[in-house]
């Protein structure tokens, strides 16, 4: 009967050990995933910080420093949580070690019980009764140790659940901070694009005004040049008609018209001015 109780206790301890190992493996996987997510968040935060330091004003930099300080505080809290997780893992390892020690003790005691049962056939009933009492006391001690181990296991499980809840809350907080950072970055980019568009529109409008003014000045200069050209051609044509008329039609037009238009003093001055160029020097051409 005692052997059956010990075997049942051994099975319970083995199942508890397996449950502890599975819980430890699940906690390790969750911690690995959390570490990967934290590394991704840190790289994303560094990238956003680099982009904001490249394109940002002092007010935005100050706001970014505040947000970065908040993120660093949360990362520090996560680090403390990881340290707590490591402490729980060490405690779990201690529990596993104690369970394995208890298993070895149970194995040794079961072997002793088997040997005692083999030797009980040769012993007296009084010795068997004393041995049975010793076995019962040892079983009671083992049950007490098993109760303590169960209490420790429940405590560790509760701590693991609390840790998972804290990790979930910190992940939600990090996600919210990341969304706020991305929203702020997008707002700054949109404002930058809008300012660039407004500046581009201003430059385009100024270029259009300058082009309109330059086109108007060009058209005005072309019109003036065309008028001067036509006037020059018109006067040249009139001068040609006058020369043709004086040369072939009426050579004495000026001789007949100038006395009627000008006074005698003016005619005399004009004659004195033009006479040297109109007289022919024939002295050298006459025969001697």
UniProtKB/Swiss-Prot annotation:
Chief place of localization: endoplasmic reticulum
Keywords of the record: Coiled coil, Endoplasmic reticulum, Membrane, Nucleus, Transmembrane, Transmembrane helix
Coiled-coil ranges per UniProt: 13-105
Location of the protein in the cell: Endoplasmic reticulum membrane; Nucleus membrane
Protein topology in the membrane: Single-pass membrane protein
Transmembrane segments annotated in the record for this chain: 227-249
Signal peptide: none
Gene Ontology annotations for the cellular component aspect, listed alphabetically: endoplasmic reticulum membrane; membrane; nuclear membrane
DNA-binding as UniProt keyword: no
Domain of life: Eukaryota
Tissue specificity of this protein: Testis-specific. Expressed in spermatogenic cells of testis but disappear by the time mature spermatozoa are formed (at protein level).
Protein name: Transmembrane and coiled-coil domain-containing protein 5A
The organism's taxonomic lineage, starting at the top: Eukaryota, Metazoa, Chordata, Craniata, Vertebrata
GN (gene name): Tmco5a
């Amino acid at each position: 009967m005692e052997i059956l109780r010990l075997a049942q206790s051994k099975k319970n301890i083995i199942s508890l050990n397996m449950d502890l190992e599975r819980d430890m493996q699940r906690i390790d996987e969750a911690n690995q995933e959390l570490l990967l997510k934290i590394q991704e968040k840190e790289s994303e935060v560094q990238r956003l910080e680099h982009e904001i330091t490249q394109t940002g004003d002092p007010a935005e930099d100050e706001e970014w420093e505040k947000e970065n300080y908040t993120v660093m505080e949360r990362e520090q809290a996560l680090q403390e949580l990881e340290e707590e997780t490591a402490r729980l893992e060490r405690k779990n390892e201690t529990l596993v070690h104690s369970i394995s020690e208890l298993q070895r003790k149970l194995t040794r005691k079961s072997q002793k019980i088997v040997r005692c049962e083999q030797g009980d056939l040769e012993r007296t009933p009084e010795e068997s009764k004393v041995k049975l009492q010793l076995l019962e006391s040892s079983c009671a001690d083992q049950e007490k140790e098993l109760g303590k181990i169960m209490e420790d296991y429940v405590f560790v499980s509760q701590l693991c659940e609390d840790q998972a809840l804290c990790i979930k809350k910190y992940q939600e907080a990090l996600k919210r901070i990341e969304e706020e950072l991305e929203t702020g970055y997008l707002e700054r980019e949109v404002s930058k694009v809008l300012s660039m568009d407004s500046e581009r529109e201003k430059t385009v409008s100024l270029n259009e005004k300058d082009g309109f003014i330059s086109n108007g000045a060009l058209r005005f200069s072309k019109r003036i040049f065309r008028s001067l050209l036509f006037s020059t051609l018109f006067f040249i044509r009139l001068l040609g008609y006058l020369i043709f008329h004086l040369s072939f039609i009426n050579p004495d037009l000026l001789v007949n018209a100038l006395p009627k238009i000008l006074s005698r003093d003016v005619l005399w001055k004009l004659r004195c001015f033009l006479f040297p160029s109109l007289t022919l020097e024939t002295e050298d051409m006459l025969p001697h």
